[in-house]
């Protein structure tokens, strides 16, 4: 499961000094918290595992979401102080700031407002927004954040690194390229969620030049006005009709009605 990989559990009994064990355990608890944030957000009540199961325990019952959230938050309050802060943690590892951000997300998603405020107060002011060049081209700044050369930029709270150089690790395309293509497709809902440059959603902004009528946008006749006057981050996130890749015009040849593609599946340096 991509929501709860077992690899976060099975390494818990490696012999090591007590302080190092505490540090690694704290990082693992933060990662487990992130997984349970995802699991409870999608499925609500799920089995809550805090120890290796025997064969007889394999069919674990569900635990109520509220109980999981309370337990996860208490774990984080106890263990986060044992995690190194940004600047002292090794590159690609959990940091206190990232763990507090995870804690804040869980609390926020579950209406635990005081816990969310307390968690985010440990993050605000500890990191800064990414800026490249002279800072005037915000579209380029946003896209540059996701390039390999900036993978340790100050804006990145939790950086996932590959051990490498394994086959396919870190590459934009997998070792095979075939269906289903929906994994790289950006939906029209995602496109339409980006506001116009006046800060208003497309159904309220006078700057929106597209059509809001159902069926107005198709693969054969894309609504090109839909992409004008929009938040620059849209073109830093999605490959849209009219954009260029490696000197070639993208003509929305994906077998999908949205005609948009998630940007990360194109070679970043070429877009």
Residue ranges: model-predicted function:
Residues 1, 7-43, 57-70, 75-89, ...:
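Conserved, well-structured interaction surfaces
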Residues 40-42, 47, 87-88, 106-112:
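Short coil/turn linking the two alpha-helices of tandem helical-hairpin repeats
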Residues 45-49, 134-135:
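Outer-membrane beta-barrel and related beta-rich outer-membrane complex signature
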Residues 50-57:
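Short linear capping/connector segments at secondary-structure termini
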Residues 77, 83, 96-255:
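An aromatic- and glycine-enriched ligand-binding surface/loop that stacks and positions planar moieties
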Residues 93:
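Contiguous mid-protein beta-loop-alpha structural module that forms a pocket-lining wall or clamp
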Residues 249-271:
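Active-site beta-strand/loop architecture of penicillin-binding DD-peptidases
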């Amino acid at each position: 499961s991509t929501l709860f990989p077992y690899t976060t559990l099975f390494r818990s009994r490696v012999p090591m000094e007590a302080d190092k064990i505490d540090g690694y355990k704290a990082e693992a608890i933060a990662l487990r918290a992130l997984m349970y944030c995802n699991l409870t957000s999608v499925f609500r009540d799920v089995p809550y595992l805090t120890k290796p199961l025997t064969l007889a325990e394999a069919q674990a019952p569900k635990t109520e979401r509220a109980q999981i959230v309370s337990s996860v938050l208490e774990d984080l309050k106890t263990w986060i102080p044992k995690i190194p802060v940004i600047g002292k943690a090794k590159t690609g590892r959990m940091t206190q700031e990232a763990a507090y951000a995870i804690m804040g997300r869980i609390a926020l998603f579950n209406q635990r407002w005081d816990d969310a405020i307390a968690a985010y107060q440990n993050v605000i002011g500890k990191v800064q927004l990414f800026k490249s060049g002279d800072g005037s081209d915000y579209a380029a700044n946003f896209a540059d954040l996701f390039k390999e050369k900036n993978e340790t930029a100050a804006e990145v709270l939790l950086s996932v690194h590959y051990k490498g150089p394994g086959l396919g690790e870190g590459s934009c395309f997998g070792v095979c390229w075939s269906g289903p293509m929906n994994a790289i497709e950006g939906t029209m809902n995602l496109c339409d969620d980006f506001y116009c440059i006046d800060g208003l959603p497309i159904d309220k902004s006078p700057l929106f030049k597209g059509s809001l009528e159902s069926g107005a946008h198709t693969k054969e006749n894309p609504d090109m006005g839909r992409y004008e006057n929009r938040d620059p981050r849209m073109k830093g996130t999605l490959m849209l009709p009219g954009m260029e890749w490696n000197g070639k015009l993208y003509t929305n040849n994906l077998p999908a009605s949205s005609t948009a593609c998630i940007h990360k599946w194109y070679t970043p340096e070429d877009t």
